Amino acid sequence: MASPGVLEESSSGEACSGGCPEQWDEKTEEELQGQFEQAAKHVQNVASVASTEQLLFLYARYKQVKVGRCNTPKPGFFDYEGKKKWEAWKALGDYSCQQAMNEYIETVKKLDPDWSPQALEEPHKEPKTTFGGPVVSCLYKVQETLREEDKDIFDYCRENNISRVSHALSTGAIDVNVADDEGRCLLHWACDRGHTQLVSVLLFHNAHINMQDSEGQTPLHYASACEFPDIVDLLLDHGADPSLVDNDGFQPHEVTDSKNIAAMLQQHASYGEHNKPASLLLEMPQ
C-alpha cells in the first residue's frame, strides 16, 4: 500500500492534539501528561521484554495521545508491520486521551514493576524515537536510502518514477514481467503502492495482468487488499480475472476490508466482464 517510511514519534510537544477534555477526573492534566512522557521515555528500557501485542498496545495509545483519532491511510500490502500498527491505532477510534495515557502508563509499570514515574525528572539526553515512544521500532525494518546509481527497476517502480520505468520498457532494457525474489512483478508493486498512472503504463506495455507471485496473489489481490478502488476498476477493465485464488484459496474480494471493492469484484465476476479482450481497452496514458 503504499509504503511509508519508519514511523517515528517524538516524546516532546503537546499531547492530545486530537482533542482532549480540559479537566482530568483523577489526575491533573499536567501530572498525567508528565507521567505519560516519562513512561514513553522508559519504553526503550523494557522493549526487549515486551511482546508484540504489548508493543502494539503501547504504540496505538501513544499515537492516540499525540495525534488523536487515526488519520493516515492504511499502509501497503508488503508493509506487514506497518499495517499491524495502523490497525491497532485505528481500532481505538475516539478513545479518550486520558484513558490512553493511563493505560500506557499502567502497561509500562507491568513491564517493569520496579519503575514508577517521578515527580521531577533529572536532566537527560534526548532519547531515540520509537515504536510507541522513544526507541527504534522493534517491528519495523528501516529501509536504506539508495543512491541513484544503486537503484533498479523495482526501486523506480516503488518511487512511481514513470519516466524511468517507461524509458526502460520502451527501449527493451527491461522485461515488463520481470519478477523479484518473491515472484512480484512491476505491476504487483505499482498496485501495492497505489500508482494508478504507472499501472496504466505497465498495462500498455503488455504486463501480465493475472501474473501470480510466490503466494499465488495477482495484482488484483494487491489492489484489493490495499484498497485502491481506481486501480481495481482499471485492472478489471483491462481483463483482470477476479476469480483467481491465491495459495490460501482466497479470491481478490476476500482479501479486502472495503465493502465497495468487494462488491465491485463480485459484481464484475457475475457479469463475466473479466473475459473482455484487454487489447480493446489498452490506451497509452497521456
From Swiss-Prot:
One of the record's GO molecular function terms: fatty-acyl-CoA binding
Designated name of the protein: Acyl-CoA-binding domain-containing protein 6
Residues holding an acyl-CoA: Y59, A60, R61, Y62, K63, K85, Y104
InterPro entries linked: Acyl-CoA-binding_protein, Acyl-CoA-binding_sf, Ankyrin_rpt, Ankyrin_rpt-contain_sf, FERM/acyl-CoA-bd_prot_sf
Domain ACB: 32-117
Lineage start: Eukaryota, Metazoa, Chordata, Craniata, Vertebrata
Major localization listed first in the record, in broad terms: cytoplasm
PANTHER family (alphabetical): ACYL-COA-BINDING DOMAIN-CONTAINING PROTEIN 6
Cell compartments where the protein resides: Cytoplasm; Nucleus
ANK repeats: 182-211, 215-244
Keyword presence, Cytoplasm: yes
Gene3D superfamilies in alphabetical order: 1.20.80.10, Ankyrin repeat-containing domain
